[in-house]
Amino acid sequence: KVWREPDAAAGIAWLQYIYWIKYGDKKYLNATRQCMAFLQNRPQKEGTFYEIMMPYGAYLAVRMNAELGTTYDELKMLNWCFDGNNSDRDGWGVMCERWNKYDVHGLVGQKKDEQYAFAMNTFSQAAALVPIVKYNPAYASTIGKWMLNLANACRLFYADEHPRNRQSSSIWEGDPQHVICYEGLRKDLYHGNHFEPFQGLLLSLIHI
């Protein structure tokens, strides 16, 4: 099986666009267009979101449409960042549910099989997509609603929101003010976990 991370095109496109802005060399803009063409020509059903880079491609689609008059399919690329329907990593997107009594709407991670949300993926996606409202204010209401949910749910990455028996590193005493977040949040330790040696304990994890 060939390992594929198609949203690498989004990450490279963003880098090349920033280089073009900084240095003015058209070769960087041409490289950006080549990467964006790959995303533009990919069918909607073949979502590209692998883990962290696709939001930068969606951001760039909105920005280039505003700055250069291109006609990239913004909604297609934005939906890839949220809906979890991806050809090479199905389920990676934004949570839209409650886990037991906890509201996890807005967090980013594996929303289907493992049901595993990650702190840095959540923070990174917010950083990439919030700025699109500068280039297309029509997204302001939707992005604002997502950010309200995200900000509310992000507290669940921190130890003081959970009893010790739901934390993988509750014995660590180096952060008495609870300002360092856990890496991830899982619906439970067994849901979608096919690796028996790790059942019952995963590093840097809170389970609900």
PLM feature segments, named:
Residues 1-3, 53-72, 94-118, 163-203:
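Carbohydrate-binding/catalytic loop surfaces
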Residues 2-3, 10-24, 55-69, 113, ...:
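Well-ordered alpha-helical scaffold segments within catalytic/enzyme domains
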Residues 1, 21, 25-47, 72-107, ...:
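Long, well-ordered core segments of solenoidal/helical folds
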Residues 8, 50-51:
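Extracytoplasmic catalytic/substrate-binding loops of multi-pass membrane glycan-assembly enzymes
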Residues 206-208:
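Conserved small/polar residues in nucleotide/adenosyl-binding loops
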Residues 38, 49, 59, 82, ...:
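Phenylalanine-focused residue identity feature
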Residues 76-87, 104-189:
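Catalytic-core region of carbohydrate-active enzymes that cleave or remodel glycosidic bonds
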